[in-house]
Amino acid sequence: MHLSSAQDAQGHTPGTPHDEQFALAAELLALLGDRTRLALLHALTCGEADVTTLTEACGAARPAVSQHLARLRLAGLVTTRKEGRRVVYALRDGHLRRLVDEALNVADHRLSGRPVHD
């Protein structure tokens, strides 16, 4: 099979997202679409935190926070480590931190009426 120079071995044009990327991005955005999960991720943009700290930060009930954190962990968005009897959570990477920050910036611009920008 002959591939044009504008496509890779899988037939994708470089720089153009393919179906798997769109599907995974949609799953990620769906997880961010929940107010409590978004608040938890935002709290983690400041650094590591345990369930008690995260519960206080987002204002949800502790069982709900634990369930949301479990979903985020299973999705690979947060990491955990043990510190004595406590479990400490952290964002997996800076991409997620920037995505959360940008989502909140868009919301802030819409609520404040400030002009959009690049």
Region locations from a protein language model:
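Alpha-helical and His/Cys-centered functional microenvironments
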Residues: A6, R71-L72
